[in-house]
Amino acid sequence: VSPPGVGAEPIDFRWMTGFECSTFPQIGMDELALTQHDRFWGSDILRALDAGCRTIRYAIRWHVVNPAPQAWDWSSVDGPMELLRHLGMEPIVDLFHFGVPVWAGTGVLSSIFPDLQAELAAAFARRYPWVRWYTPTNEPYIMSQFGGETGAWYPYEHGPRNFVRALRNVARGVCESWAAIREIRPDARMMISDTCEYWHALDERAEQRAALMNERRFLMHELHGGRIGDDHPLRDWLVRHGMEEADLAWFRENPAELDVIGLDHYPHSEHELSTGPRGELVDVARPLDRQLGPAELCRQYFARLGRPLLFAETGAPGDDPTKIAWLDRLVDEVRTVRGEGVPVIGITWWGLIDQVDWGTGLRRFRYEIDPTGLYALEWRDARYEPAEAPDPPEVDGRGYRLERVPTAALETWKRYTAASPETTVGPLASSSTNEGMALW
């Protein structure tokens, strides 16, 4: 059963938003709590609707809904899900947006991780059978890389073997959680969002690494999709770093094919690799005026993966002119590739409100606001709120609230969402590559 009102949007393009929702309970980090969305979810969801977004990426927090093995607490989810359904907004539900419960041990490096994720998926699908769209795992490649290879996030491991181990577990979690959902809702649809990047080598030594990274960006989608056979360019690399042939065979026999590929793309998503003074590889963001650009990356991802594309995360941290320039550029490039027949079916500004402490990679508490949203966050001392204020102050336990302040970028966004897609992103040209392809 779909929410009332869903289906009124144009069938081949949607404007979307969401709320940054990463959690790392091992260090007490919870972005929805830092931004106070966990308290003010109702007014935030109404702001998303007012911004013209009838489809929204919305996450649950695994450690909150599943506080102990096989124990469930849906009190933080029931209200938002009920409101979304009442408003006729369609959620694409993030079941695992980084962060596993403390009781889950080593998380993505644990052999039982896929089973735990499947339990979560089944429990959610049983409770909310009307939900149709799912993201079982947000950025599974990034989760594997940051948790298993670079040590940036829990479980803080390093090296290619731990990366491949995490990759296998996370990809299997996608497959098993998706199978669990489809048992309960056979017509459910899946969108996995992951990094949309490109590496440019500036010297000969960097060329090999750039080539590897430009192959690796497709790796997670192709692994859980059962597409890695003997002729895959990274098959030998995977086996050399611990992937068993039996693992690859399992994925080919139990694929989780996507309905939509989610592209997470920002101004810093193209890289320049060069050799530093001590022989180390240096990775920096490529200047915008030298980038291939979103249109070319869409062509590459569609040619490789052959599925409809959605900008599942995008935005430009900074002031309003920076955000508006990025949005205008992205819309122009989406119009270009849709005119070529590349099925780009949505843009998601991430997130609707500013973030807190994302500048630290959510590794340290500084309570610093990162200017990423269409609504700016500003600290207010609620103790001095005028008693006659028309709206009650949204306060936290310390007497402070984060006020949501509309920006000029929001007004630009709303002009796009209010207009016909034919006049903004243009019609999707028919082609042999998208013929008969299910979009929304």
Region roles according to the model:
Residues 18, 34-36, 42-44, 55, ...:
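Glycan-recognition patch characteristic of GH18 chitinases/ENGases
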Residues 19-25:
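Short polar catalytic/cofactor-binding loops
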Residues 39-61, 254-260:
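Catalytic domains of carbohydrate-active enzymes, especially glycoside hydrolases
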Residues 51-77, 93-96:
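Aromatic-lined carbohydrate-binding/catalytic grooves of carbohydrate-active enzymes
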Residues 25-27, 64-67, 101-105:
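A short acidic, helix-capping loop that chelates divalent metal ions and anchors anionic groups
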Residues 2-11, 78-322, 332-431, 435-440:
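Active-site region of glycoside hydrolase catalytic domains
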Residues 9-19:
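Transmembrane beta-strand segments of Gram-negative outer membrane beta-barrel proteins
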Residues 26-39, 109-111:
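Active-site mouth loops of central-metabolism enzymes
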